UniProtKB/Swiss-Prot annotation:
UniProt GO MF annotations: ADP binding; ATP binding; proton-transporting ATP synthase activity, rotational mechanism
Self-association and partners: F-type ATPases have 2 components, CF(1) - the catalytic core - and CF(0) - the membrane proton channel. CF(1) has five subunits: alpha(3), beta(3), gamma(1), delta(1), epsilon(1). CF(0) has three main subunits: a(1), b(2) and c(9-12). The alpha and beta chains form an alternating ring which encloses part of the gamma chain. CF(1) is attached to CF(0) by a central stalk formed by the gamma and epsilon chains, while a peripheral stalk is formed by the delta and b chains.
Name of the gene this protein is made from: atpA
Name of the protein this chain belongs to: ATP synthase subunit alpha
Keyword Transport in annotation: yes
Source species of the chain: Neisseria meningitidis serogroup B (strain ATCC BAA-335 / MC58)
Chemical reaction(s) catalysed: ATP + H2O + 4 H(+)(in) = ADP + phosphate + 5 H(+)(out)
Subcellular location: Cell inner membrane
Family (UniProt): Belongs to the ATPase alpha/beta chains family.
EC number: 7.1.2.2
Length: 515
């Protein structure tokens, strides 16, 4: 066989000319150890803090400890199949979750994957879970109300759009019930709600979703669930994922409300991760940055001004402010609000609603302690009519508590003291409200107006709630224009007051309310 040198030369030349030298450069590392969802990796020299790492079997992790000779990462999900010697690659991306209107009405996990069996979520938009909070110049002061529909909250500790109001109390004091009422009350207001369930039983979360569906609230709600059975890493990132989903609406000039239920369990999950990563423990074995864990999350709840919205939407939305209101929940142990995490979150938020076991067991629900519950900015956002009529409620309750304690030692009370005690009892009774029976501004104003003008002075305490309910029904049927006027203007005119006075007289003459 004759070899042709020229032919061979041409073949080699063609091969060299067509040689593809494109190479994908990816930093790879090797798994050194796997323990309790924490993976130590050698060789990832270019890893970023918070970067997504890819493990075999399409599993992802989060780089958290960048040390001299190894990287400590947490696995986001199952880790049983990861073994020593496996190859890990850097993705070059920070953890992102899907965002957009397509998520509304769905139940997703901490990574934004649907878990409600209703098929895939068709959104192309994603956003990083960690974002820098809006700066001072980008913010606008809180001056619009975020109505919860609960008399005790809207009259005494009002919440404004863009505020952070902590709900704090022992277990089984109705913390979730207050938050769910606030979500249900946003129906028809255009406010998108995000409910983040952290470390709860799957059955409890299913129950919450069912209740929201029953009251038509899932139409404007996203539920982010990281159940107690899921990895600690997912419980740790769930609030950040939910916050990113809420920021999508805030940055487009809309209003959103986010509930974190609850941040105590997130702190416990973060403590677990930190201790397994061998980070030095501090007070109550929490790591040193547990304050920053919550502050960087809650600072993202804000009201942003028109210029910021215009800038973030590239000029598409003009003249609109956006807001993200946060209702974080903290569970205390035996009423100890001076523990590490409760004191941290109290100092970060713009006020707190204290729920007490004794009040709850006494049948006062919502079990709000009006004496130590405050709203530091909500007063500026309160509806005019509620601010005017509700001003005396807190004072009446404070005086009642003081006199009630004093009256235990005194046998004979003068007439003025006795009247004040009776008034306080009626106010306490009227602040009670059943779950999912929220009131609008006008209905709430009606009750407060009746308290202020002494309409309940001759009504027995036991019949006060029934009297309130019947009077509301009476005004709804006989004078609906009064309620419409108050809802429309946010104030009560002299004409409306005269109509209500006549209505009260007429109602009292026809309704048998005496003992």
């Amino acid at each position: 066989m004759q070899l042709n040198p020229a032919e061979i030369s041409d073949l080699i030349k063609a091969k060299i000319e067509n040689l593809s030298v494109n190479a994908e450069v990816r930093t790879c590392g090797t798994v050194i150890s796997v323990t309790d969802g924490i993976v130590r990796i050698h060789g990832l020299s270019d890893a970023m803090q918070g970067e997504m790492l890819e493990f075999p079997g399409n599993t992802f992790g989060l780089a958290m400890n960048l040390e001299r000779d190894s990287v400590g990462a947490v696995v986001l999900g199952e880790y049983e199949h990861i073994k020593e010697g496996d190859t890990v690659t850097c993705t070059g991306r920070i953890l992102e979750v899907p965002v957009g209107r397509e998520l509304v009405g769905r139940v997703v996990d901490a990574l934004g994957r649907p878990i409600d069996g209703k098929g895939p979520i068709n959104t192309t938009l994603t956003a990083p879970i960690e974002k820098i909070a809006p700066g001072v110049i980008a913010r606008k002061s809180v001056d619009q109300p975020m109505q919860t529909g609960l008399k005790a909250i809207d009259s005494m500790v009002p919440v404004g759009r863009g505020q952070r109001e902590l709900i704090i109390g022992d277990r089984q004091t109705g913390k979730t019930a207050v938050a769910l009422d606030a979500i249900v009350n946003q129906k028809g207001t255009g406010v998108i709600c995000i409910y983040v369930a952290i470390g709860q039983k799957a059955s409890s979360i299913a129950n919450v979703v069912r209740k929201l569906e029953e009251h038509g609230a899932m139409e404007h709600t996203i539920v982010v669930a990281a159940t107690a059975s899921e990895a600690a890493a997912l419980q740790y990132i769930a609030p950040y994922s939910g916050c990113t989903m809420g920021e999508f609406f805030r940055d487009r000039g809309e209003d959103a409300l986010i509930v974190y239920d609850d941040l105590s369990k997130q702190a416990v999950a973060y403590r677990q991760i930190s201790l397994l990563l061998r980070r030095p423990p501090g007070r109550e074995a929490y790591p040193g940055d547990v304050f920053y864990l919550h502050s960087r999350l809650l600072e993202r709840a804000a009201r942003v001004n028109e210029h910021e919205v215009e800038k973030l939407t590239n000029g598409e939305v003009k003249g609109k402010t956006g807001s993200l209101t946060a209702l974080p929940i903290i569970e205390t142990q035996a009423g100890d609000v001076s523990a590490f995490v409760p004191t941290n979150v109290i100092s970060i938020t713009d006020g707190q609603i204290f729920l007490e076991t004794d009040l709850f067991n006494a049948g006062i629900r919502p079990a709000i302690n009006a004496g130590i519950s405050v709203s530091r900015v909500g007063g500026a956002a309160q509806t005019k009519v509620i601010k005017k009529l509700g001003g005396g409620i807190r004072l009446a309750l404070a005086q009642y508590r003081e006199l009630a304690a004093f009256s235990q030692f005194a046998s004979d009370l003068d007439e003025a003291t006795r009247k004040q005690l009776e008034h306080g009892e009626v106010v306490t009774e009227l602040m009670k409200q059943k779950q999912f029976s929220t009131l609008n501004t006008a209905e709430m104003a009606l009750t407060l107006w009746a308290i202020n003008n002494g309409s309940y002075s001759d009504v027995p305490v036991a019949k006060a709630l029934a009297f309130e309910s019947e009077f509301l029904s009476f005004v709804r049927t006989q004078h609906p224009e009064v309620l419409e006027a108050v809802n429309a203007s946010g104030a009560m005119s002299d004409e409306s007051e005269k109509t209500l006075e006549a209505a009260m007289k007429s109602f009292k003459s026809s309704y048998a309310y005496q003992a």
